[in-house]
Amino acid sequence: MSKDIATPGRTTEILKKYGFLFKKSLGQNFLIDSNILTRITDTAEITKETNVIEIGPGIGALTEQLAKTANEVVAFEIDQRLLPILDDTLSNYDNVRVVHNDVLKADVAEVITEQFAKPELPLKIVANLPYYVTTPIILKLLHDNIPADSMTFMLQKEVADRISAVPSTKSYGSLTIAIQFYMEAELAFIVPKTVFMPQPNVDSAVIHLKRRKEPLAKVNDEEFFFEVTRASFAQRRKTLWNNLASKFPALKPRKEELIEGLNAIGIDLIRRGETLDIPEFAKLSNFLADFLAEK
């Protein structure tokens, strides 16, 4: 059996063998600490009755750990230069398939059906996400309604803080709401920048997202709900009124009527967006949708 990939020596050996040079544009940072990999698979609760989608396998360090613990692993890799390396490093595992595709452009549901021998098994998504595409990837997976029980991501600590934030904190914002509306979010542990090659400028964190049985609040129009939440954080230091009136100019001539209606459901327009929790944003968006629809 070959040595684990996730060590400084083995990673350097693989990179030299293939003359691989990191592409900064792809945000490539490879893990060189196998203990972190074990903690990731433990956090994700991977078992032999679990299928896993991995995004951005790199040279296969996390993929290898997933292959040891999961039923099957399907990994999306955008960098064609890594395909022969992955063929080599993962040659001992017959339960891994690498798909050369950009997950942002892929039909992930179709890949699940085509690539897994038992697509009916519980699905989990695990990834060491490049910093520059973290948010688009997570939001795509949520909006495409990929049937994953959970998603476990290693990402920039600042982004993990934003995803797992609570109201009235600096990190709380529209990203928090976009994810926590559908998923329970737990920041599992911090990953120091020293366990990557090359070493990034900031620490990372592993976040575990578990799908809720139902969205956290009932909204009449999800698209409008997210439009309202984004508008409410457009300028964080401004009040709800200032941000919403800027987004929806039709509110301006009816300000007093709006204040009265929102006060009746416990929402004061002099508050800032960061003070509202998700159920309050749901009440706000449902009210605004009806209010704006009135002639």
Swiss-Prot record:
Gene3D superfamilies: Ribosomal RNA adenine dimethylase-like, domain 2, Vaccinia Virus protein VP39. It holds the Pfam family RrnaAD. It is an enzyme of class 2 (transferase). Its main location: cytoplasm. It catalyses: adenosine(1518)/adenosine(1519) in 16S rRNA + 4 S-adenosyl-L-methionine = N(6)-dimethyladenosine(1518)/N(6)-dimethyladenosine(1519) in 16S rRNA + 4 S-adenosyl-L-homocysteine + 4 H(+). The keyword Ligase does not apply. GO terms for cellular component: cytosol. Specifically dimethylates two adjacent adenosines (A1518 and A1519) in the loop of a conserved hairpin near the 3'-end of 16S rRNA in the 30S particle. May play a critical role in biogenesis of 30S subunits. This is Ribosomal RNA small subunit methyltransferase A. It comes from Listeria innocua serovar 6a (strain ATCC BAA-680 / CLIP 11262).
